[in-house]
Amino acid sequence: VKRILHLVLVVPLLYCIKSEAQIETRWLDTSASSTNKELGIFFTNRKLVDPGEGEDVTFKNRWLRQTRNLYFCRYDFESKEIMLKYRATKTCSKKKYPTGPVDNSFMYKVYEDLRINQGIRNFVFIIPGHAKTFDKQINDYMFRLQRNYADSLRSTAFITFAWSSESLGALYYRGQRAADRSANDFSIFEHMLESFLADSAFWQEHPFDISFKLICTSMGNELLRLYLIKREMQGIPLIPVYDRIILIGSDAPANAFARGEGFDHLLEMGKSVLLLVNRRDGPLTMSLYMNLEGRLGLVGPTNITKLPDEIVVREVTHLISKSDLSTLGHDYFLRNQVLMDYILHQELSSELPSEL
């Protein structure tokens, strides 16, 4: 109830900040979604490939540019068919974040399909890392997500932001630039979610018994951090829409919670934050040398003693298995069963197991 009240009071103020910053929406498929639990859900800012006659819909496999578009889709893992559902376009400049009202928002359809028709009450939004082509994002990352968290699918929907990332991990700096650009497109999704939750008339008629988590892995953390920095620079207040924000393998700098560095505002968009630290993370060790600065998921926050109680830091180094080390200790979100259970199901006050 407090969250709804906050949204009702704050979101109208956003509409007065920059009234010209709007989102145009277009339905591409209004048919009811299948109740098949194997269908993945994602949204992407990649460029849509013009399909030839008889060809399936797909997106640019390698794409680094900002599009000002978000496509919301379902994906059939068996037939590998992409079902375009909806497109949202930001009509203001590339770097400006939307603040105006959103007509015909896709969020209402998501609520109807998943909450009303399927009884799903938990929504987990995921911003993955870079070094992923589009094919790898949906056929590897999303497939493993559905498989490894299969026991949760009856009550939880996993929705992935398949952002325009670099296709090779070695091209690290290009991946950083792609995260910077994709942060601008992520503003479309975040504003639509905030506007949906602020619709007091809708919630008077529908049950507000849903929860939202945001999970960022690897460079997805940096994408979120850049989004927060730019939003603060534009003077747009944050809205507490998430019950928990979870930072895994964070490639954000170790001072990310310092004033003006982005994550100092995380508790303004979520009730609590969980940060996992693995001191045996190979890719983050390489990132440390490339940036000449410690990484949040490797060494932890520099100002850890000054963090509020709602931000919990858990070191998971002792739980990294030999299997995790085969991927240099960076892929435990989709590999380590002990940590997977803890990430989704445990309270922040719960201690991690002392060993595997």
Task: Label every model-predicted segment.
Residues 121-124, 211-213, 244:
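Structural motif
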Residues 1-6:
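Bacterial N-terminal signal peptides that target proteins for export
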Residues 7-15:
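Bacterial N-terminal signal peptides
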Residues 109-162:
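Short, surface-exposed "cap/lid" segments of acyl-processing enzymes
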Residues 17-21:
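Sec/Tat signal peptide C-region and signal peptidase I cleavage site
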Residues 22-97, 131-132, 143, 151-210, ...:
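Lipolytic serine-hydrolase domain surface
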Residues 90-120:
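Acidic, polar low-complexity linker/tail segments
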Residues 186, 216, 220, 224:
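Gly/Ala-rich beta-loop-alpha elbow adjacent to hydrolase catalytic centers
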